A protein has these predicted regions:
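N-terminal glycine-/serine-/threonine-rich beta1-alpha1-beta2 phosphate-ribose binding loop
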Residues: 2-150, 166-178
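Predominantly a Rossmann-like dinucleotide-binding segment in NAD(P)-dependent oxidoreductases
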Residues: 57, 175-180, 185-297, 305
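Short helix/strand-capping hinge loops at secondary-structure junctions
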Residues: 149, 155-157
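Conserved PLP phosphate-binding loop immediately N-terminal to the Schiff-base lysine helix
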Residues: 159-163, 188-189
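Short, small/polar residue-rich loop motifs at catalytic or cofactor-binding pockets
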Residues: 301
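Active-site beta-strand termini and strand-to-loop segments that position acidic
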Residues: 305-311
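Short, mixed charged/polar active-site loops
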Residues: 314-316
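Conserved small/polar residues in nucleotide/adenosyl-binding loops
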Residues: 320-329
């Protein structure tokens, strides 16, 4: 916790000053954690023989989670919440089919309103909740989930502000509930194979790593009817830097055994290129009065961050949400 209070704030300050943003508030002393509670890093929740699972958000991402969890023995899908009833029903039918009449028999549906998920938490009382919504809702939904008595599993990123991250930590400690960010790349077969090689000493001394999140995502600007992806566009106007570092950085941190006693992140510098790609895409594909042509895109087309660890090892983390070619229509 002391590491989070000191080094994470200083690393953000050191790296993000390169963007000309005022982060002086990070330099002020602040009692982030007020619980004086037990550290949750080594906490093991009591075993649950049949885990009652609920889902908030079952669009392109959440629907996949619903099917995967429903297929695991020892789970019982008890509720699904989404803004749109047809999406909720699609996952409902998929889970029922996977249950084959033996499991997932009583799935409650909560749809049609932005706060139906709160009603779900209050009425169903699940053991675990999987959250796959837009970024801004991740933290408040995770916090309310833990307060309701359930463990929270949250899509990337877990939160978008330092204050929300600390509220998640405090709530987890107070409620004794897990809150896990579902950084799936940490658990990919290729990544786990390489991690195993690192731990067996096959790779040798690990001195430098390069990680990246490189996608063409401008096509999501077209998903306006239901906002399934277009909500990202606003973040490119209000945020700067690497908005999605953990896909690449998570596995690398494991390879280097960071945050586990041997070594840790020490300092960071971060620079972004000018932001031109989304502006040009908007001008080409939408009329001049369209909302996408009214945004001041500030998130650079390419961000490069360099991290140095306590032992002097280095990591380069690259990020872009556009490519020279489009990978989807």
């Amino acid at each position: 916790k002391d590491f989070l209070k000191l080094s994470s704030a200083s690393a953000m300050l050191f790296g993000l000053k390169s963007h000309g943003i005022n982060f002086s508030y990070l330099e002020r002393p602040y009692d982030y954690s007020k619980n004086n509670s037990q550290y949750m890093g080594d906490f093991a929740a009591p075993k649950i023989n049949v885990v009652k699972v609920a889902f908030i958000g079952v669009g392109a991402r959440g629907s996949g989670h619903a099917k995967q969890i429903a297929a695991i023995e020892g789970t019982e899908v008890v509720a699904i919440s989404d803004l749109y009833n047809d999406l909720a029903m699609k996952s409902y039918e998929a889970c029922k089919k996977i249950g084959n009449g033996n499991r997932h028999k009583n799935i409650a549906i909560y749809s049609g309103g932005e706060n139906k998920w709160k009603v779900m938490l209050n009425e169903v009382k699940p053991d675990a909740v999987f959250i796959s919504t837009n970024w801004d809702n991740h933290a408040p939904m995770a916090i309310e989930t833990m307060k309701s008595g359930a463990h929270a599993f949250v899509e990337v990123p877990m939160a978008t502000t330092i204050e929300d991250l600390w509220e998640i930590v405090n709530t987890s400690e107070k409620t004794r509930k897990h809150c896990m960010m579902m950084e799936n790349v940490n658990y990919g077969r290729d990544e786990l194979m390489y991690l195993n090689m690192c731990r067996k000493g096959i790779i040798g001394d690990f001195l430098h790593a390069e990680a990246a999140y490189i996608h063409e995502l401008r096509f999501q600007m077209n998903e306006e009817k239901r906002g399934t992806g277009s909500w990202r566009t606003h973040h490119y106007a209000k945020s700067r830097g690497n908005l999605y570092p953990t896909h690449g950085l998570g596995p690398v941190a494991q390879y280097m055994n960071l945050c586990r006693g041997d070594d840790n992140f020490n300092s960071l510098v971060s620079f972004s290129s000018p932001a031109l790609g989304r502006k040009l895409y908007a001008e080409k594909n939408y009329d001049s009065e369209h909302k996408w042509n009214k945004l001041n895109y500030s998130n650079g087309d390419m961000n490069t961050s360099i991290i140095k660890t306590n032992l002097g090892r280095t990591i380069t983390v690259s990020y872009t949400h556009l490519r020279a070619h489009e990978t989807r229509p």
